[in-house]
Amino acid sequence: MKKATAIILACLFVLVMAAACGGTENEVTPATQPSPTPAASTSTPAPATETEDEPEDDFDTDRVIAVFTREDGSGTRDAFVNITGVGDEMYIEAVVQNGTSQILTGVETNETAIGYVSVGSLSDSVKALAIDGVLPSDATIINGSYSLQRPFLVVVTDEKKEDELVQDFLDFMLSSEGQEQLGSTWTSPISNPAAYAPSGLSGTLKVGGSTSVEPLMQRMREAYIALNPDVEIEISGGGSGTGINEATSGMLDIGMSSRELRDTEKEALTDISIALDGVAVIVNVANPLTEMTLETVKNIFTGETTRWNQIG
């Protein structure tokens, strides 16, 4: 019995030792783990200093200047060529347009363009340049520091002035009520305009001519008819030359002109200034230029300067 018990204990001892040895052989010594690599930053690197600056202007100054001008007979053209000294030497390649709106559209849609329009017709679609350092404004037109300016005139024959309705409308345009229509767009040539009393007249007036004066005349018309509802006023364009010629012939009761009458025209017509207006030199809004000398304006419109990079 004792011998059997000893044998059993010996066997158990062997089994325990075998298990212990097997566990030691199968145990894996953990390998030294490498230090974790820091995760790459997901934030966007700060841009280089030069990328924070505004982009350089990409306006190509090597391009040819596209010159836009008004037609012969336009009061705006006459005032412009006389004041700048362009005279009869308008650039042969200049694109001739027959109205203010056409000039505005031409300059708005062509980055290389330059043109001129009435200050009262300016819009945000184009950029007006300072001339010799002076921008067109009510103040600079009144004090004369802005050189490109001219009067807005209505012209009538002596015969038409005798017409009661014609005279009443003329009186209205020169009155305080009429001059209020200039707003901040045009400058009044009258220091102390008189008040206007509605006449109660009726009838139809035909007024036509300068497309520069036309926007102001539309305002005058609306204000006058509000006070005299039995009056109709028909307004047409065509340019200052048309207004002068048709007023002379009697086709119009009142002509509109944005240039002074010539001596031969004064024989048949009386001119009356209803406002002062500047002529703005305009470029495309993409053009980096903000000012120009009057001499440079002349050189461009005579064709002496043909590229933007020739302007100092």
Question: How should these model regions be labeled?
Answer:
Residues V16-A20:
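C-terminal motif of bacterial Sec signal peptides marking the signal peptidase cleavage site
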Residues A4, G22-G312:
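Exported/periplasmic ABC-transporter solute-binding proteins
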Residues M1-L9:
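Positively charged n-region of N-terminal signal peptides that target proteins for export
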Residues C11-L15:
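Alpha-helical transmembrane segments
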